[in-house]
Amino acid sequence: MTTLAIDIGGTKLAAALIDNNLRISQRRELPTPASKTPDALREALKALVEPLRAEARQVAIASTGIIQEGMLLALNPHNLGGLLHFPLVQTLEAIAGLPTLAVNDAQAAAWAEYHALPDDIRDMVFITVSTGVGGGVVCDGKLLTGKGGLAGHLGHTLADPHGPVCGCGRVGCVEAIASGRGMAAAARDDLAGCDAKTLFIRAGEGHQQARHLVSQSAQVIARMIADVKATTDCQCVVIGGSVGLAEGYLEQVRAFLMQEPAPYHVALSAARYRHDAGLLGAALLAQGDTL
């Protein structure tokens, strides 16, 4: 059965057709609308989906935010241009005329990456470092979503009680410091206004402030991973997202993690499916692969 998979992120929307063998075809992307209105997101999704829907039999959505009974609830509204509530499943069913499933994007990506691991791995955590910071937890071969859909939102754990206010309302969240948006917000002087991609470029050129911002992000993520190891005793952690997959970033995270006491060390690897992990995980779940 062909699935029309959609990934809704803070900076881009992606869609593709995925068959039962996880082959991807006709991948398309659009920028996530900056408008705070539901109509803007609805129209962007319609433009993304219309060319693909005739060949699909179902829709699977991986979206940033919390998914509750088909509704998209933004824990950090800044990641979706201020959007707080959006009837995601209802909207896509109306656009595509197909049965629709929705799941958090990091949870979906965790499920895809779990399937790429050796069979003896039953406990893993996926962490995405991108516009925001998210995660997905697989425990004893089962994806944890939680009754309220909050499971795996690791970016909203505490990094610094004196840190910046996060869009979720807490102070000093991992996401507020380590995410691409958090790094950009902390940039000063000649880096003010630069996005995360530019900060990585400048860091590669030796710019001291840019190098500090990248290093600080990696250290915060490493400390969070130590907390995750203590909480879940996972066998491995997989890192994805535009920041997480940036050149040299994983190596910095690994170096900082090795500075933690040995019980908190855990194997780290880059996401095998890279930026397609959310699409593939959502398709797997829609196809009934829930173990």
From Swiss-Prot:
Binding-site positions, ATP: 5-12, 132-139
Sorted UniProt keywords: ATP-binding, Carbohydrate metabolism, Kinase, Metal-binding, Nucleotide-binding, Transferase, Zinc
Pathway noted in the entry: Amino-sugar metabolism; N-acetylneuraminate degradation; D-fructose 6-phosphate from N-acetylneuraminate: step 2/5
Disulfide-bonded cysteines: none
GO BP terms in the entry: N-acetylneuraminate catabolic process
NCBIfam families: NactlManKinNanK (NF047821), PRK05082.1 (NF003461)
Subunit organization: Homodimer.
Family: Belongs to the ROK (NagC/XylR) family. NanK subfamily.
Function recorded in the entry: Catalyzes the phosphorylation of N-acetylmannosamine (ManNAc) to ManNAc-6-P.
Name of this chain's protein: N-acetylmannosamine kinase
Taxonomy of the source species: Bacteria, Pseudomonadati, Pseudomonadota, Gammaproteobacteria, Enterobacterales
Gene name per UniProt: nanK
